[in-house]
Amino acid sequence: MPKQKTHRASAKRFKRTGSGGLKRFRAYTSHRFHGKTKKQRRHLRKAGMVHAGDFKRIKSMLTGLK
């Protein structure tokens, strides 16, 4: 049986944390900041964690990611 390959688009969007979790980056951060408040922009800078409901599916796409 062939090896399972890492989904390359997912590998560029998620990073593994030291405790085994997955870090993700937030949406709505590319343009149109004039319509957002300072508080919204500040919170969008921070990375988020992948939720438990999505974790198993995303982890299967990232087989080779360390």
UniProtKB/Swiss-Prot annotation:
Residues 1-22 are annotated as: Disordered. It comes from the Bacteria. GO terms for cellular component: cytosolic large ribosomal subunit. Keywords: Ribonucleoprotein, Ribosomal protein. GO terms for molecular function: structural constituent of ribosome. This is Large ribosomal subunit protein bL35. One of its GO terms (biological process) is translation. Belongs to the bacterial ribosomal protein bL35 family. Residues 1-16 have a biased composition (Basic residues). The keyword Ribosomal protein applies. It comes from Streptococcus suis (strain 05ZYH33).
